[in-house]
Each structure stands twice: as structure tokens, then as C-alpha cells.
A protein has these predicted regions:
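Asp-based, Mg2+/Mn2+-dependent phosphohydrolase catalytic module
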Residues: 33, 57, 61, 78-179
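A metal-dependent, Asp-based hydrolase signature
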Residues: 1-44
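Glycine-centered short loops/turns at secondary-structure junctions
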Residues: 67-68, 141
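Polytopic alpha-helical membrane proteins, predominantly small-molecule transporters/carriers
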Residues: 49-50
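Conserved phosphate-coupling serine/threonine residues in phosphotransfer and NTP-handling enzymes
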Residues: 75
Length: 179
């Protein structure tokens, strides 16, 4: 997390941190071939296939066919990294847009609503991070559907709470029933 203030969220910041830690652990004796292995690992990370979780594509297809919603990917991270990950996922046909921000804050959600000319109360954010996806939206008066994932980055851990605009789901497919 030390490189996040400089580089934000993303694979490139992770790669730099990995290199810095390797230098530290080796006592500054990291060899060129070891650096090459770490760089290769970082490049592989940037090219991993973006396989959607079970039920995501089916659910997005149902929501798209209903034609009642503007579906937007709103994510944080490094622009090129996130755009490439999105394209590799194969989910582009289901969305109207992708918006990448350096961090998900109340201000960034408000700007998202302004961009699409909607009131905050019309926004439903679906996500797995209570800190980034859910809490800022609830604070603004929007709606949020929290679908926890079995692992979470320590940086994203916060105390979760109940809220009248909060939907707690176990599976992405449940969106078909609640929307």
C-alpha cells in the first residue's frame, strides 16, 4: 500500500511494491534475472483473462434486455489497466460505459450521477467492497447492493452496518429478483 498515494490502485503499483520488497528482502542483492522474473510476473498479471464470476453474464443479459437501466462499470484503479481488464472480461456489450477513477469517494459518486443526469437517489451501486462500493453511496442517499466476496483486501475492511438503502445479497444472480 506504500505506493498507492503515488500510483493509485492497480497492477503497476503492485509490481513496483513487489520489486521494492524483493530488494529489501534480499538486502539490496537482487540479481538481474530475479528482477526479470518479477517483471515477467507483473506482465502476466496485466494479461490475466477476466473471467466473470458465475451468473454475472446471465444476470447482466437479463438486466440489459429489460431496458430499464443504464449499466455502468464504475471502478477505481489505473485507467489502462482497468480498461484492458474490462475488455478481457467479455462483458462490454452489457454496459453503457466504463468510468475509472483514482478512488471511489462521495465526490466521485456525485460526479458519476451528474455525468448521467440522475439524482443520487436513483443510483444503485453493486459491489463487494463495503468501504469503496457501498458506504460512499449510502452516505450520499443512494442505494447499494452489497455482495461480499470470500476474500477482501485488508485496505478495504471497514465496519459494516445496516441501512434502509442497503440490499445484502449472497449472489450476483439475486439482482434479477430485487430489480
Amino acid at each position: 500500500t506504500a505506493n498507492m498515494p503515488l500510483l493509485g490502485y492497480g497492477s503497476k503499483a503492485f509490481l513496483l511494491s513487489l520489486l521494492e520488497n524483493a530488494i529489501e528482502v534480499s538486502g539490496g542483492r537482487l540479481k538481474a534475472d530475479e528482477v526479470e522474473k518479477i517483471i515477467k510476473l507483473g506482465k502476466e498479471l496485466l494479461q490475466l483473462p477476466g473471467k466473470p464470476m458465475d451468473g454475472v453474464e446471465e444476470t447482466l443479459n437479463v438486466l440489459r434486455e429489460r431496458g430499464e437501466y443504464h449499466l455502468v462499470v464504475f471502478t477505481k484503479g489505473e485507467l489502462l489497466d482497468q480498461e484492458n481488464k474490462f475488455h478481457r472480461s467479455g462483458l462490454k456489450p452489457y454496459f453503457d460505459d466504463i468510468i475509472v477513477v483514482s478512488d471511489k469517494t462521495e465526490a466521485s459518486y456525485y460526479q458519476l450521477c451528474e455525468r448521467f443526469s440522475i439524482n443520487v437517489e436513483q443510483l444503485l451501486m453493486v459491489g463487494n467492497s463495503f468501504r469503496s462500493d457501498i458506504e460512499p453511496v449510502l452516505k450520499l442517499g443512494g442505494w447499494a447492493a452489497h455482495i461480499p466476496f470470500h476474500t477482501i483486501w485488508q485496505h478495504e475492511v471497514v465496519v459494516e452496518y445496516e441501512h434502509p438503502h442497503l440490499l445484502k445479497l449472497e449472489y450476483f444472480t439475486q439482482l434479477k429478483q430485487v430489480l
